[in-house]
UniProtKB/Swiss-Prot annotation:
Protein name as catalogued: Ornithine decarboxylase
Lineage, uppermost ranks: Eukaryota, Metazoa, Chordata, Craniata, Vertebrata
The UniProt record lists the keyword Lyase: yes
Name of the encoding gene: Odc1
Summary of subunit composition and partner proteins: Homodimer. Only the dimer is catalytically active, as the active sites are constructed of residues from both monomers.
Residues with Phosphoserine modification: S303
Keyword set, alphabetical order: Decarboxylase, Lyase, Phosphoprotein, Polyamine biosynthesis, Pyridoxal phosphate, S-nitrosylation
């Protein structure tokens, strides 16, 4: 396992009843009298560990290989390395990141079917053998650059019901798969298994069933050609937050019977997956500050109703946008919802509003239309479930810097992390079994404890 110490990055250890949202409020309070109200994240590493415990319970036969592309923050990768996950890397840089944390090459799959030759050679020189392919050209490249590679054939799936489709770009058909297996045999390249990806944000769990069935067909083809395949990679597509129509356990309740049917536990086949957003989406909350505001009045409609004819629309400009953290709107089809850092008054009027990023691009719009009470420059908005495909793809367009990330973890989760590193996972440990132990959050975190921040009632967004 990789090492994990809170000294590697600034991770605040939290007291019982002191949550990530309390730290978020505390950070806001710290800059309340300053003009430097930069956007920032609070990321709960304990949430990542809880997701892992949930995974072990829901998919006991499937070893997760975290998709580094989803969120390559060093703290995230360190946490997952420490608890023993594998890693799905798509480039030399991602392999360097993971191996730099002490992860052995056998816990890495180079899961990019279309690789640059120099990066194939890098994988070879650093002991990374598992890698995917879906074409004859890729086979020939690997045969020359990494003849000892252990190849995994990526097959296409029906991803028509996924939010982000992948099978248009990647994956071999069943017909092509046989030809590729025969060609691999001719080239004396070892094919050890099959992989697929049903698309990011899968909305139909039955897609997994068909994909597992297709994988079984390809395994049988491999046997006929002369390969002894022993690895099935079921890819990603698992939800990472609770605001999705399809819940994680709804998917796993369909996957497990399919695996038992087509790849029973005594078949000798190792099963892995490539979850990304599942592990990190809900761990990150983004706080943005309103830097500008504009009021737009609707045109007169001729109505006698003054409220209708003069209703105002409010435009808010905040200090992060689609060129930064909210690139997920453009590239990941995300629909984000602004929450209020301060609780509105019960009788407060709400207005039609829109939220815009800070750049000079007219496309930099975060929310086209929402209903919010009137807010002011200097007020804060919060966006939950912002850990997936946000920080990893953020740019500094127009000179706007990426938000800082403040990492937190409860004392009990920290203790569990250390126990896992020393002795492995405790028997029968489950997500709901993890409580919290009292200690001084100020002592552990090095921050002043604000009474208001430690009151759970103050967190209403």
């Amino acid at each position: 396992m990789g090492s994990f110490t809170k000294e590697e990055f600034d991770c605040h250890i939290l007291d019982e009843g002191f949550t990530a949202k309390d730290i978020l409020d505390q950070k806001i309070n710290e800059v309340s009298s300053s003009d430097d109200k930069d956007a920032f994240y609070v990321a709960d590493l304990g949430d990542v560990l809880k997701k892992h415990l949930r995974w072990l319970k829901a998919l006991p036969r499937v070893t997760p290989f975290y998709a580094v592309k989803c969120n390559d923050s060093r703290a995230i990768v360190s946490t997952l390395a420490a608890i023993g996950t594998g890693f799905d890397c798509a480039s030399k840089t991602e392999i360097q990141l993971v191996q730099g944390l002490g992860v052995p090459p056998e816990r890495i799959i180079y899961a990019n079917p279309c690789k640059q030759v120099s990066q194939i050679k890098y994988a070879a020189s650093n002991g990374v053998q598992m890698m995917t392919f879906d074409s004859e050209i890729e086979l020939m490249k690997v045969a020359r650059a990494h003849p000892k590679a252990k190849l995994v054939l990526r097959i296409a799936t029906d991803d028509s019901k996924a939010v982000c489709r992948l099978s248009v770009k990647f994956g071999a058909t069943l017909k092509t798969s046989r030809l590729l297996l025969e060609r691999a045999k001719e080239l004396n390249i070892d094919v050890i298994g099959v992989s697929f990806h049903v698309g990011s944000g899968c909305t139909d769990p039955e897609t997994f069933v068909q994909a597992v069935s297709d994988a079984r067909c390809v395994f049988d083809m491999g046997t006929e050609v002369g390969f002894s395949m022993y690895l099935l990679d079921i890819g990603g597509g698992f939800p990472g937050s609770e605001d999705t129509k399809l819940k994680f356990e709804e998917i796993t309740s369909v996957i497990n019977p399919a695996l038992d049917k087509y790849f029973p536990s005594d078949s000798g086949v190792r099963i892995i997956a490539e979850p990304g957003r599942y592990y990190v989406a809900s761990a990150f909350t983004l706080a943005v500050n309103i830097i500008a505001k504009k009021t737009v009045w609707k045109e007169q409609t001729g109505s006698d109703d003054e409220d209708e004819s003069n209703e105002q629309t409010l435009m808010y400009y905040v200090n992060d946008g689609v060129y930064g953290s909210f690139n997920c709107i453009l590239y990941d089809h995300a629909h984000v919802k602004a929450l209020l850092q301060k609780r509105p008054k019960p009788d407060e009027k709400y207005y039609s509003s829109s939220i815009w990023g800070p750049t000079c691009d007219g496309l930099d719009r975060i929310v086209e239309r929402c209903s919010l009470p009137e807010m002011h420059v200097g007020d804060w908005m919060l966006f939950e479930n912002m850990g997936a495909y946000t920080v990893a793809a953020a740019s500094t367009f127009n000179g706007f810097q990426r938000p800082n990330i403040y990492y937190v973890m409860s004392r009990s989760m920290w203790q569990l992390m250390k126990q896992i590193q020393s002795h492995g996972f405790p028997p029968e440990v489950e997500e709901q079994d993890v409580g919290t132990l009292p200690m001084s959050c100020a002592q552990e975190s090095g921050m002043d404890r604000h009474p208001a921040a430690c009151a759970s009632a103050s967190i209403n967004v």
